[in-house]
Amino acid sequence: MSRIPLTSIEQQPEPVRQWMARRGNLKVFRLLANAPHVFPGWTQMVDELFESPTFSRRMREVVILRVAHLQGSRYELSQHVGIARNAGLTDQQINAILDTDHPDAAGFSDTERTALDVTSELCTTHRLRDDTFAAAQAVFGDEALTELLMIISCFYGLALVLNATDLDVDATARFQP
């Protein structure tokens, strides 16, 4: 049970209700809607991250699963493992992402391995070494690297909220990317 009560979907403004319905009417949205001055902007950012052509669904899910694992976010993992499969990740690759020490052992592309390295280092040390940053910048360029960092920060921050509030995993509802 969440440490903060979940809002009622019916009491939300129509645009928020529509967004929640489109994305799956999840408990996480009912939790975050407790911040009505911030939630609409957050939903817009999430939409932009999922609709941006910069990264494939597969790449986004590689990053999201790694963040969720490193942050111990049971909720994010429960929502995104299925999405990752639908985006083309194999169970072997998903298990490798969830392996703290060796996420690169399952046939990831060089670009995916670079994203995993950036995600792992940033989530565990809260910084990027110069060589890691330079390698990522060479692979992604400034625009895509910035977007990658924004994906990491979005799901890292969300994991903190979910872990702090101890939000229960939805029984059946799933996120609709």
Where does each model-flagged region fall?
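Hydrophobic alpha-helical segments
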Residues: M1-P177
